[in-house]
Amino acid sequence: MAATAAEAVASGSGEPREEAGALGPAWDESQLRSYSFPTRPIPRLSQSDPRAEELIENEEPVVLTDTNLVYPALKWDLEYLQENIGNGDFSVYSASTHKFLYYDEKKMANFQNFKPRSNREEMKFHEFVEKLQDIQQRGGEERLYLQQTLNDTVGRKIVMDFLGFNWNWINKQQGKRGWGQLTSNLLLIGMEGNVTPAHYDEQQNFFAQIKGYKRCILFPPDQFECLYPYPVHHPCDRQSQVDFDNPDYERFPNFQNVVGYETVVGPGDVLYIPMYWWHHIESLLNGGITITVNFWYKGAPTPKRIEYPLKAHQKVAIMRNIEKMLGEALGNPQEVGPLLNTMIKGRYN
């Protein structure tokens, strides 16, 4: 990744940039949180640039500046969505901090002492807007983050916008890569300063920014040992245990070696987040509401002939499968860690 990223530094991957018709830069460094680790810029390229195709083919991140993937949605704001999105239910998370750590409610029974750091509530879109405006008016620490898969409850205008997405381009990407089906389009509406802590997904993702600006810091799968994910059976599976704001280097010493790949995406930008790449996402400080739509695809089928040496993401998949199988064989997820320690301690190091 380093070589290809270096080629694209000239395109301004990590610098505040001026938008067409804007007076000055769209954002500045004061809107970014400070962290202890170094980062390199993610390339910003035209979708017609051969280097962009090469990066996607190699499963490396790239920001595509001109796909027009979600062009009809660039007019979306809270008012437009409230008028047109329909009367369906939306999942809205609330937290007393800026961090929204994902958790799987189905796995909470495995860890009885687990307490989620955010609460999920189902509400109508107008209720979300009213609650958001109330929080903004009275101040305080409470934050909201709407995260909802787009479905058939949306209104006609949203359907028309959705049909106007550049499906021709994205379907070609899917076909060229041999990916599986589109599994979902996740709508994300966040308050300024909201953070989704570092995690990885087991799907390919085109992350399309619609409103506002988001900073995205990615880490390749080979930095797994630096990011210390929760156990597979934990509700926060696939999430890093490291607090980026205040890293505990005694518990997580390898985090000192982590190196990120960074960009800020704005309206119309599409970030390719490869499967198994860690990503930390933050809505810029003092940047207003952000709106994003994810395009999640299943990965390509496992090739019949495995090539060695295995790639880092394949090793992550193997580790996940080992944890899952041990949990099933032992009948108790709590026994997985002690058994792995018994197997490895003093034998392989």
Swiss-Prot record:
This is Hypoxia-inducible factor 1-alpha inhibitor. Residues 2-125 are annotated as: Interaction with VHL. The gene is HIF1AN. Changing residue 201 to E: Loss of HIF1A Asn hydroxylation activity. Slightly stimulates 2-oxoglutarate turnover. The keyword Iron applies. It is found in: Nucleus; Cytoplasm; Cytoplasm, Perinuclear region. Gene3D superfamilies: Clavaminate synthase-like, Jelly Rolls. The lineage of its organism: Eukaryota, Metazoa, Chordata, Craniata, Vertebrata. Its EC number is 1.14.11.30, 1.14.11.n4. Changing residue 201 to A: Prevents suppression of HIF CAD activity. Fe cation binds at residues 199, 201, 279. Residues 1-51 are annotated as: Disordered. The record marks 340 as: Important for dimer formation. PANTHER family: HYPOXIA-INDUCIBLE FACTOR 1 ALPHA INHIBITOR-RELATED (PTHR12461), HYPOXIA-INDUCIBLE FACTOR 1-ALPHA INHIBITOR (PTHR12461:SF105). The keyword Nucleus applies. It is an enzyme of class 1 (oxidoreductase).
